[in-house]
Amino acid sequence: MTESTSRRPAYARLLDRAVRILAVRDHSEQELRRKLAAPIMGKNGPEEIDATAEDYERVIAWCHEHGYLDDSRFVARFIASRSRKGYGPARIRQELNQKGISREATEKAMRECDIDWCALARDQATRKYDEPLPTVFSEKVKIQRFLLYRGYLMEDIQDIWRNFAD
């Protein structure tokens, strides 16, 4: 740690660190708190910031006030990002829960997002197993397991074959 950074107050160092973290991508409040509390890797190994709980609260409040930290924006972007990567609603909900997002906020964002999960599940299945999708039971089970692992709901998976039969 340099001499100039050691003289800076803990609040200023925390705020600088928070802005750097949030400049890369959106984070949930819980993620930011966890990252701010983690020790900083310095030249001589991990270094603690001697900050009080009040300093952490002030930094979080400042980030909220200035629009750097917004859980609803984070949730909407996270859902869009993970759905583009081919993950289903169950997996996305579970990941958001791990990131400290409330169930109510997650459900609200899932209702507001305009994603056709059945079409997305079909797209993932055809990417992995080619078109047309197999109708043999053993092959259908493989596809179902794959889609369940990716986080799709069983009703969306079954709709693939119902719509395919039409």
Swiss-Prot record:
GO biological process, one term: regulation of DNA repair
UniProt-annotated location(s): Cytoplasm
Major location (coarse): cytoplasm
Swiss-Prot/TrEMBL keywords: Cytoplasm
Pfam family, one: RecX_HTH1
The keyword Nucleotidyltransferase belongs to this UniProt entry's keyword annotation: no
Keyword Cytoplasm found: yes
GO cellular component, one term: cytoplasm
Function statement: Modulates RecA activity.
UniProt family annotation: Belongs to the RecX family.
HAMAP family from the UniProt entry: RecX
Protein name stated in the entry: Regulatory protein RecX
